[in-house]
């Protein structure tokens, strides 16, 4: 029952959308399902990264997620064999910067009732300012390796690459690689982030206390991992398409974090693109498809059969994809939904959640396990 309640809202929206377009679920029988990658071919595990250390930074520190476990598992199937270490930084949350300024004193009130809730604290920008020197110091002490950042952590990587770009004391180009997952200010081969579309370079995002950085040509190879339709890293470049926007908003919940736990078998070859910059460094984009559209995935968690899910994808996907200019030419468009090899966000996230909290593999069990952990392991209130 709880599982159904969790998915009901999104499922209802999807049904309404399909109905508005004149294609009910039952009427989808004549709709061609979304095709998987041609011939079932998917990418071999490419040779990526720099051996040695794995310098890892997570996203915003949110209650109810196994934070350290997530960081240590980020990109583990893409960059195996690294000697991983967590690079500490504040990892401030949006509400921590915003709410305390709108409602002075709310942070202290929140700490009384739920320590660690984060109603006050360092901003996104302040977190980057602390994280960048921490990461540079870790690299100088630890030596060669691959630097991995998820979400907010990716912004720390951007700042570090900018600082090292023309630093004569920077490590040699062949001693470091950088890998971002769900970069909030990333521009990739198939599109770009919400923030870079909405805010010009040099402008400050008020709720983040963060200035949009100018692009920098790094001397280090960079890998950008993007979950298709993640509203943070893969915002529609035609935002007047409300179906694309709705799908991307749900894509934040389904794929923004889960992309960190994917593996090469989930990616068709045409979703990997590499360019070489003027300094000889490679910039590789890896776009990873989910097995269904974010708007459709909740139906899977409601128990809807695979055939119906594929038909729903077939109904909605042309409308969703119209919001992205990358799909104008079918010959160069990436595969963004793959019902055969695409990833299930709940399934790829479950091992990290179970390792930290226990519980089942379904989304509701993971959520409840996280909430139970928060209730049972609250830090002591501040005096």
UniProtKB/Swiss-Prot annotation:
Record keywords, A-Z: Acyltransferase, Cell wall, Lipid biosynthesis, Lipid metabolism, Secreted, Signal, Transferase
Location within or outside the cell: Cell envelope; Secreted, Cell wall
Coiled-coil features, chain-numbered ranges: none
Name of protein: Acyltransferase PE
Induction section of the entry: By lipidic substrates. Expression is induced approximately 50-fold in the presence of Tween 80 and 2-fold in the presence of tributyrin.
Biotechnological applications: Potential target to impair mycobacterial growth and to increase drug susceptibility.
Function as written in the Swiss-Prot or TrEMBL entry: Acyltransferase involved in the biosynthesis of trehalose polyphleates (TPP). Catalyzes the transfer of phleic acids onto 2,3-diacyl trehalose (DAT) to form TPP, high-molecular-weight surface-exposed glycolipids consisting of octoacylated trehalose with seven C36:5 and C40:6 polyunsaturated fatty acids (phleic acids) and a C14-C19 fatty acid residue.
One GO MF term: acyltransferase activity
Signal peptide: 1-28
Record keyword Transport present: no
Pfam families associated with the record: PE-PPE (PF08237)
InterPro entries xref list: Acyl_transf_PE, PE-PPE_C
GO cellular component, one term: extracellular region
Limits of the PE-PPE domain: 80-325
UniProt EC number: 2.3.1.-
Inactivation phenotype: Change in bacterial surface properties resulting in lack of sliding motility, altered biofilm formation, rough colony phenotype, slower growth rate and enhanced susceptibility to antimicrobial drugs including rifampicin and erythromycin. Loss of trehalose polyphleates (TPP) production.
Source organism of the structure: Mycolicibacterium smegmatis (strain ATCC 700084 / mc(2)155) (Mycobacterium smegmatis)
Metabolic or biological pathway: Glycolipid biosynthesis
Record family assignment: Belongs to the mycobacterial PPE family.
A Gene Ontology BP annotation from the UniProt entry: lipid metabolic process
Chief place where the protein resides: other
Post-translational modification: Proteolytic cleavage of the signal peptide is required for export to the cell envelope and for production of trehalose polyphleates (TPP).
